[in-house]
């Protein structure tokens, strides 16, 4: 587990964030440039469910799945689950690695209409995903006669919290 590695490393109380690096190649081909380096707050890094894996189904982890090591951070976007893991950096500030700033893997800090451009300071790093929902019945465009009662079906989910009710 990631937690075990961090405990073995004797993480200092000043730790705020981790930074994860993989063996990805930068699109420019320049080996001096980092393709992507995501991270998580130290409290999330210490979660029991985060894994550093080297096997899948009793076999060495396939290259396409992140061989030789992959970090798995359940409940957060897949981009945080670093493939081809080469380094974990414990930071005393929010990690500012490649793809942690600007519009990369970020979302508005507050609700906005689609297409609205926001300054970088109004964007936040995507962490756990918000509740999402989908109506599966009736189909889009179905006309329901006024006064007719129907059952609405669908799904609601979230990455780290339980959904216990849905208001329609």
Model feature map: region roles:
Residues 1-168:
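Structured, non-membrane catalytic/scaffold regions adjacent to prosthetic-group chemistry
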